[in-house]
A protein has these predicted regions:
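Gly/Ser/Thr-rich active-site cleft segment
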Residues: 17-19, 122-227, 329, 357, ...
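Acidic, glycine/GT-rich loop-and beta-edge segments that sit at the periphery of enzyme/chaperone cores
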Residues: 262, 431-486
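Activation-segment/catalytic-loop signature of the eukaryotic protein kinase fold
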Residues: 318-411
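Active-site nucleophile and cofactor-binding loops and adjacent substrate-binding regions
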Residues: 54, 80-85, 104-107, 126-131, ...
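A short helix-loop
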Residues: 132-144, 161-166, 182-186, 190, ...
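N-terminal glycine/serine-rich phosphate-binding loop of ATP-dependent small-molecule kinases
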Residues: 1-101, 148, 212, 216, ...
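ATP-dependent carbohydrate kinase catalytic cores
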Residues: 176-275, 286, 303-306, 310, ...
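Glycine-rich phosphate-binding/hydrolytic loop that grips phosphoryl groups
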Residues: 232-235, 284-285, 292-295, 362, ...
Length: 486
């Protein structure tokens, strides 16, 4: 970065390591997004085994490209680096910080047995176990890799290691985590989990080597990060019980803050990354990717996303009796069924691509409602739902989410909420704001509010009832097809 006058604005360099791409932003200390760049990387998958892996070196290359792109804008002086990443994923590294194998990402299903075993031993489930089930799987199934591994890290922690040279396990205030003795008894050496640091604290300073690789000055404070979903909560402006959000993105999901713990089958329930609150919600598998799948794989990429959504908007609510199940990669919350598959139901000659596109968009909203239904039944009350990510750029998509769920919907000023959340965490870490709630309140804004249309409630209630019944109805047939029995 070229030298600048003292009057240059102070900014945070925020790195959001998502499932399909990294987003890097320059964010002002009042929350304005001044520059954004992104770069992608592939995922290696094998549906037969449940494998889903990525190359950590590909992450670093993508980060380097994106950082250099935003730094060319010269919009300000970087005073901190904030981090978040997808998860629960696992990166195994040696003593020098080099990966000993590909990263096992959250879509990988090979460690389900280890997940259950760790849950039984610790009382923790879901995100609270981080990448530990995958680490235990590596210890049991890949002894050569395990022997070469010094540290098991989350995605955001491996970025901090690469930037500063310091291994650490970043945990939110009050976040439960298994103790080393319990891990040892299960066969996962607790010594391979780095010492804990508080998310939002300074891990270290940017090393000269990392600074040269990224094209920025050394010595910038690097702040301990968190999972992208939690960063998105911060970036969306969630502060109070009843604040909810849909993170958008490749998977889709729903999360809400509440004032007490809730036990909801099929959903995660843990502390919130804010003291005194609890977080409950679920992440789907591929609802956000379904529109792109249809646009690229089925239609051959002949339309832009905007043009396809315009066609979807030209069809009636309910897509003239067409319903879509968005389980293109199995489903996580609330079904937790990796064998689930997608389906169009009710298809006829009267349906065109606009109908199919609308059915896919409506299915993403139905999936949110499916997760939220159990949470509301357990006692939570949704005050508003903030919609984020790429889908929130579409007025149609936002309105459909309001209509289908019945929730008041708010659109944040910065849709890249994980980027914004990483910046909020980093700004707090260097003392730019007195505390995290103040930073969230001061660095997040709402630009649009949408209300559900009451005249569509009965229609979408009927659709949701059909949506819930459809998966159990066709699941036996789907399994027969997968097993070659039909």
């Amino acid at each position: 970065m070229s030298g600048g006058a003292p009057s240059r604005e102070s900014v945070v360099l925020a790195v959001d390591l998502g499932t399909t791409e990294v987003k890097v932003g320059l964010v002002a200390l009042d929350g304005r997004l001044l520059a954004l760049a992104r770069a992608g990387y592939p995922t290696a998958t094998d549906p037969a085994t449940g494998r889903a892996e990525q190359d950590p070196d590909a992450w670093w290359a993508a980060i380097g490209l994106a950082v250099r792109e935003v730094m060319r804008t010269e919009v300000g002086e970087v005073v901190a680096i904030g981090l978040d990443g997808h998860g629960p994923s696992l990166v195994a590294v040696d003593a020098a910080g080099r990966p000993t194998r590909s990263a096992i990402i959250w879509q990988d299903t090979r460690s389900t047995a280890e997940q259950a075993e760790l849950a039984a031993a610790t009382g923790l489930e879901g995100w609270a176990l981080a990448g530990l089930p995958a680490a235990l799987w590596v210890e049991r199934h890949e002894p050569a890799v395990a022997a070469a591994t010094c540290w098991y890290l989350a995605t955001w922690d491996v970025l901090a290691l690469r930037l500063t040279g310091r291994p650490a396990t970043s945990l939110a205030e009050g976040q439960p985590f298994p103790d080393a003795g319990t891990l040892d008894r299960l066969g996962l050496p607790g010594a391979k989990v780095p010492p804990a640091v508080r998310a939002g604290s300074v891990v270290g300073q940017l090393s000269a080597e990392a600074a040269t690789s990224l094209g920025v000055r050394p010595g910038i404070p690097v702040v301990a990060g968190m999972v992208d979903a939690w960063a998105s909560f911060h970036g969306a402006g969630m502060l109070r019980a009843g604040d909810a959000m849909d993170p958008g993105g490749a998977a889709g999901g729903f999360g809400i803050y509440w004032d007490r713990p809730l036990v909801v089958p099929g959903s995660f329930s843990t502390i919130a990354p804010l003291p005194g609150l609890y977080s409950v919600g679920g992440a789907m598998a591929a609802t956000g990717r379904a529109v792109d799948w249809f646009r690229v794989e089925v239609l051959g990429g002949v339309l832009t996303t905007e043009a396809l959504l315009e066609e979807a908007g030209g069809t009636a609510p309910g897509a003239d009796g067409l319903l879509f199940l968005p389980y293109l990669a199995g489903e996580r919350s609330p079904l937790w069924d990796p064998s689930a598959r997608g389906a169009f139901v009710g298809l006829s000659l009267q349906h065109g691509r606009g109908h199919l596109a609308r059915a896919i968009v409506e299915a993403s909203a139905l999936a949110i409602r499916h997760v939220a239904e159990g949470i509301v039944a357990a006692g939570a009350e949704v005050r508003t739902m903030r919609v984020c990510g790429g889908p929130a750029r579409s007025e149609l998509w936002n309105q459909i989410k309001a209509d289908v769920t019945g929730f008041e919907v708010e659109v944040p000023a910065v849709l890249e909420t994980a980027v914004a959340g990483s910046a909020i965490l980093a700004a707090t870490g260097i003392g730019a704001w007195p505390d995290l709630p103040a930073a969230i309140g001061g660095m997040s804004r709402v630009r649009r509010h949408l209300s559900p249309r009451p005249e569509l409630r009965a229609r979408y209630d009927r659709m949701f009832d059909a949506y819930r019944r459809l998966h159990p109805a066709i699941a036996p047939i789907v399994r027969e097809l997968q097993e070659g029995g039909a």
